[in-house]
């Protein structure tokens, strides 16, 4: 069993520079991550299951549509090898608060399963998968203090 923190994301500044044809905002921003966040506890299981607990659990529709499970399925589809998992997501980040909670959860799951995998993904494959899950997932995967541009795909450590 492992427990991993999915830290909340704080935008130090955010400038919207335009919009793409598919509706994404073009950004110039700097972000940092807090010590506060959601917690994912992961342990081997026969079948995949996700339990959502915590103060803000009721703000999520259901476990089946959660980005954590989408990330897990995407990891396997990308060639990562991992057995069945029981995942408990403790929601400490308010849902819809602009703190990147869902993206942080998906990124934390990817970090954890890649470490546990008997056939982990290389960094490029992991970041491509993260980008396919959402614009904030790659920066949440990178962590630290980042200057981001585009729709979030261009990151420079600060």
Question: Where are the language model's segments positioned?
Answer:
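Acidic active-site catalytic centers that drive phospho-/nucleotidyl reactions
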Residues: 9, 105, 136
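Alpha/beta catalytic cores of group-transfer enzymes, especially the acyltransferase/condensing modules
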Residues: 120-158
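ATP-binding N-lobe of GHMP and related small-molecule kinases
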Residues: 1-97, 115-119, 124
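Acidic (Asp/Glu-rich) catalytic motifs at the cytosolic membrane interface
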Residues: 97-103
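Short, small-residue alpha-helix embedded
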Residues: 103-116
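Generic structural signal for isolated residues within well-ordered alpha-helices
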Residues: 74, 112, 128-132
């Amino acid at each position: 069993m492992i427990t991993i923190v999915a830290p909340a994301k704080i935008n130090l500044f955010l400038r919207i520079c335009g919009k793409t044809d598919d509706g994404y905002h073009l950004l110039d921003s700097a972000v940092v991550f807090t010590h506060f966040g959601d917690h994912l506890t992961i342990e081997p299981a026969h079948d995949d299951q996700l339990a959502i607990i915590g103060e803000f659990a009721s703000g999520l529709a259901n476990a089946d549509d959660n980005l954590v499970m989408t990330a897990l399925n995407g990891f396997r589809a990308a060639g990562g090898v991992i057995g069945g998992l029981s995942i408990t997501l403790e929601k400490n980040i308010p849902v819809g608060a602009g703190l990147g909670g869902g993206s942080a959860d998906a990124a934390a799951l990817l970090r954890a399963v890649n470490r546990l995998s008997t056939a982990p993904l290389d960094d490029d494959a992991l970041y491509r998968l993260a980008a396919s899950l959402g614009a904030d997932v790659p920066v949440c995967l990178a962590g630290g203090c980042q200057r981001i541009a585009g729709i979030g795909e261009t990151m420079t450590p600060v």
